[in-house]
Regions:
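Short, surface-exposed interaction patches in beta-rich subdomains
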Residues: 164, 172, 178-280
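Acidic (Asp/Glu) and glycine-rich low-complexity loops/linkers
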Residues: 20-136, 143-156, 162-175, 184, ...
């Protein structure tokens, strides 16, 4: 019994210490920073939720986060990029808030990169000459309305981009490692895309005179709702594409891939024995 007494005292002390442990302060802290800025490059990291708002009159950043994160929030400029991050690894309590709203006025160029399960929202229609948009490592964006002369979109590692409404001169879309892109593309000149490793690109509507698509490693593209004059295709690794072409359709099908096409184009496609091209 005497031997058990120290153990019992230790257990009681441990329970007391646990019960007295303070819960984190979840009070919301709100700040306005970077007023009247000329920033055009934004890096969103570590699960931050950032909303970009087109604002023709003002440019500033509103921050909102749980008070216990005060010493860990890291929002600042690094090499012309405005970073939304934390300065060290920290366990984030359930219900924690760490988000920002970025008001952006008219820009010639806009670069947005989201990493590590961050969430992007874009409110309003953005008009820029040059747009570069990246979603990395399971990041998400559910609205993307952009008019741009040149636009580059890149998704990787399970990232998702929905609600695309693009109007512009040229556009490229790359999606890799189980990523998904869905929306409408109105392209005046050339649309180029590369999709790989179980990824998807689904285009619900729009227009484009020419397109070049590369689909690999069991990935899927569906462009049946967009009538295209000239298209080149490269399908490999059991991939699948559905297209709508009016004049010329050229390219290669390899390793058990399948190409479905609408329209009556002139076809010049090299097809491996285990691949298939079919009209619909």
């Amino acid at each position: 019994m005497k031997a058990l007494k120290p153990l019992l005292l230790f257990c009681v002390a441990l329970c007391f210490a646990t019960s007295c442990k303070k819960n984190p302060d979840m009070t919301l802290v709100q700040k306005t920073v970077y007023e009247n800025n000329d920033l055009s490059m934004f890096h969103v990291d570590d699960g931050w939720e950032v909303t970009f708002v087109y604002d023709s009159l003002n440019s500033f950043v509103e921050l909102e986060y749980s008070a216990y994160l005060e010493d860990y929030v890291s929002v600042g400029e690094v090499n012309e990029w405005l970073n939304f991050d934390f300065n060290k690894q920290i366990y984030k309590q359930a219900g924690s808030v760490f988000k920002a709203t970025v008001h952006i006025s008219q820009k010639e160029a806009l670069y947005i990169r989201a990493d590590n399960a961050s969430i992007i929202t874009m409110e309003g229609h953005f008009e820029v000459e040059d747009m570069d948009f990246e979603l990395l490592n399971a990041s998400i964006c559910k609205s993307f309305e952009v008019t741009s002369q040149s636009c580059g979109i890149e998704l990787s590692d399970g990232s998702q981009l929905y609600g695309v409404d693009f109007h512009g001169t040229n556009c490229t879309v790359y999606a890799h490692k189980e990523s998904v892109c869905k929306g409408c593309f109105n392209v005046e000149q050339t649309f180029t895309t590369g999709i790989g490793i179980n990824s998807q690109l689904i285009i619900f509507g729009g227009s484009m005179p020419s397109a070049s698509i590369e689909v690999k490693e069991a990935s899927t593209i569906n462009m049946a709702e967009v009538e295209i004059k000239d298209m080149s295709v490269y399908l490999d690794g059991g991939s699948e594409a559905t297209v709508n072409v009016t004049e010329t359709l050229s390219g290669f099908l390899l390793s058990g891939s399948t190409l479905y096409y609408k329209g009556h184009p002139q076809i010049d496609v090299d097809c491996s024995d285990d691949s298939t091209i079919r009209p619909i």
